[in-house]
Amino acid sequence: MKRFLAAILMLAILFSTQALSEGMTSNAPGEEGMAVASFDQDFLGYIHAQNEKENYVVSPLSFRTALMLAVEGADAATRAQLLGAMGFASEEEMTQWYATVRESVDFFEGWVARQEQIAEEEAQYYPSGEAPEAPAHAFRVLNSVWNNADRFGEFLPDYVRAIAERYGAAADSAAADQITDAVNRWCDEATAGLIPKISDDLSECAAALVNAVYLKSSWVDEFSKNMSGPEDFTDIDGNTTRRDMMKARDRYLYYEDKDTRLVSIPLNGGLSFIAVLGDDANWLSNYAAAEYTDVDLWLPKLDTESAFGSAALKGYLMDRGAVDAFDANAADFSRMADQAWYISDILQKARIKTDEEGLEAAAVTMLVLAEGAALEMEEPQYREFHADRPFRYYIITTSTPTPLVVFAGQEVK
């Protein structure tokens, strides 16, 4: 290939608008979809800027969902700051977003159930009484919270009840010498082995909030293995390597202008794999404008895994105003626990694999909480303002939409 694949997972696995309809609908996102996507675009842009010359895979959905577990236990400024950094104007908007996630999962599971029913009906036509086994499909968004029994603080019953009802989250407790293995085992099972471990040591944490996303789906039209083979791939530095390339000639949703080429490869269960060559700044609007076109498609097989830590994930949130949650003296998670906690670390691991049959991908995001300063015992943090040198002053109105300067002056001697 003579051009670099610009989006090796901004290649995004996109929740297509077909996911909520049995029929073929427009691929154009609605106003609400565009608003939701603005968080994804912003987050992906931040990650891309730090990994511009590396293959990577990341899950905005997993990151956002894990943060929802924190929001449910946060209060006051901590809660408001997290909501804003997550791109939500209100708690209601957050709830609506997660309802859309669940609708996408429910649609996928409905498709799987229909395929299983069809297979059962067709089994009678086979001599063995069993139809050929279909590829396994799964789309899971799972949540869990973990309390270190040997540290101070426990989850409040109201918090445990709320996250169970709203996000299906399971709450568990483990001793300091067991919590690491317990959390890693949960991640391994939730991701079918793609993410076998999220942490090497959680023994010192007070709690962990964990989300896992797992997807395994087949292409609507599978690639022929007979057409696959090695081809040149020119990387971002201009170096050429041989990559195992899948090939197809078919009709796909396709967009092209002088800077960009975009193709949408449909996956079963109401999902699409969007690949972009060139400038991907407007990939979502370009996808909305794509039309069915005959395409000679080459796509390299993927097996990419990534790990992101606090430098990227906590850094992203703090740059967008969510600072109190990470401050031991300011964090307010009083709706979560009976002791003062703060978020000490955020981790995400993700992996994606593709072949001629389909795609398998997983991500785990974990928020690690540590013991903070008790809010009721907190000493005020005074900022010094000593007018002991020349200064200016202004007397303004605060009852008007725009302040009026009634008096102004200075003292210099």
Identify the function of each model-found stretch:
Residues 1-8:
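Positively charged n-region of N-terminal signal peptides that target proteins for export
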Residues 15-31:
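Sec-dependent signal peptide cleavage junction
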Residues 32-59, 63, 68-77:
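N-terminal targeting/tethering segments
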Residues 53, 92-277, 288-377:
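Non-catalytic, conformational "gating/processing" segments within enzyme and secreted inhibitor domains
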Residues 57, 65, 144, 273-275, ...:
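Structural recognition of the beta-strand scaffold that forms the well-ordered cores
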Residues 78-86:
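Primarily short, surface-exposed interaction patches in extracytoplasmic proteins
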Residues 209, 261-276, 375-413:
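Extended hydrophobic
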